[in-house]
Amino acid sequence: MNKNIIQIYLFVFILLLKQHIVILKNEEFTNPYSIRKKDIKAIVNVNNKLKSINIHKLDNINKKDLLGSYNENYILIKLKKQDIFSKKLSTYYGEVQIGEQSENNMNVLFDTGSSQVWILNDTCKNSLCNNIHSKYKRTKSFVYKYDKKGLPSVIEIFYLSGKIVAFEGYDTIYLGKKLKIPHTNISFATKVDIPILEEFKWDGIIGLGFQNGDSIKRGIKPFLDILKDDKILTNKNYKNQFGYYLSDKEGYITLGGIDNRLKNTPDEEIIWTPVSTEMGYWTIQIMGIRKEYVNNHFEENKEEEEVIVKYEAFHDGGKNSIIDTGTYLIYAPKNTMENYLKDLKINNCDEKYNLPHLIFQIKSDEIKTIKGSAIIEIVLTPNDYVIEYVDKKNNTKECILGIQPDEQSEEDNVDGWTLGQVFLKAYYTIFDKDNLKIGFVRSKRNVTLR
């Protein structure tokens, strides 16, 4: 073996020995249209690293995470970013092909806040199905879905921002231009009454959520269940998981595995939290949140240090929180925003440096060697949660908070936090379907993959 290769492996092995998982011991303590749910606001610049909090060390390092061979262990789906400056709005979408011969190229929103798959049909003629959109043309591989009376199934899908009317059927979907998902249940929209869609460039939604009451009633299988039950990923030696990465200009989904180049540092450990699927969302338990004031002017140049964190935290009373790739902002429980975070305000970009770090205390993946509840801590800096954008009218830089109170918690059945794309730009997030858990690791800024 080449001497240089031996040295590289030795260096990687040393890094593995030095790694540790960060956790904190705590003894005290649906209808989906995501961009819909909340007002989406513009463009975020993300930087700063995850603060290392060392309370306990574990030795079971997953070497595959470190030594995995990038594009060989996942399917890459590139996400394009669309900014609508007049509305301080941004969205990310990716391309899929539909039809056995890939006849239809469509742009879709990949939405963990939904279990529905729908696209615009070529019979949709109202103004919201305008010329910026691609529309599905029926293929030879299309099959109708029939209702109990033997008639083609027609449905209405209601969202907080409106509704769509669609007929149901089946066709083949290709992801990353090479992963084939045959006989996928799709709703083909013939009428759209969601005004905000008119300016978006995506043509439909691929829901990456779980089964809910609606999907059970309609007898449809969520997209992720198709991938798992039909062994579409595992038959090709991929995992039933996907990573979600966003940058200032674009993003990526790594379907079937992870890419360490998207981490802040390649050997940085992923920290995991268990997931509940009862509501159809990727639901996690946020146990509390606290503020930490630091000198943000110098934070980027500081060496990271291990910090012992106090056990106590503000408990916001809303544990069930969701990770939603289809929502742009972060939404806090209204009571939390009006009380504990009431001083979280910004009038100009200079005031960003006076804002605190926000530290989320999240239930950890079960670790049997620790007594009590294991808690992981996720840090958001002002650079993470303050949105910067350019006012085109005055050509000035403006700043707004990327965290807003959740005024719609009753409608979407979420009593805790909704962590949208503002959060996801700070953390490369791994959604593990097999083990029902989510992993977080600080993102490296503005990575470009080929």
Swiss-Prot record:
Protein name: Plasmepsin VII
Gene Ontology CC terms, in alphabetical order: cytoplasm
Entry's family note: Belongs to the peptidase A1 family.
Alphabetically ordered keywords of this record: Aspartyl protease, Cytoplasm, Hydrolase, Protease, Signal, Zymogen
Coiled-coil features, chain-numbered ranges: none
CDD domains, per the entry: pepsin_like
Active site residues of this protein: 111, 324
Domain Peptidase A1: 92-441
Compartment(s) of residence: Cytoplasm
Pfam entry (one): Asp
Xref: InterPro entries: Aspartic_peptidase_A1, Pepsin-like_dom, PEPTIDASE_A1, Peptidase_aspartic_dom_sf
EC numbers on record: 3.4.23.-
GO biological-process terms attached to the record: proteolysis
Signal peptide (residue range): 1-24
Practical applications according to UniProt: High doses of antibodies against PMVII partially reduce infectivity in A.stephensi mosquito.
Gene Ontology molecular function, alphabetical: aspartic-type endopeptidase activity
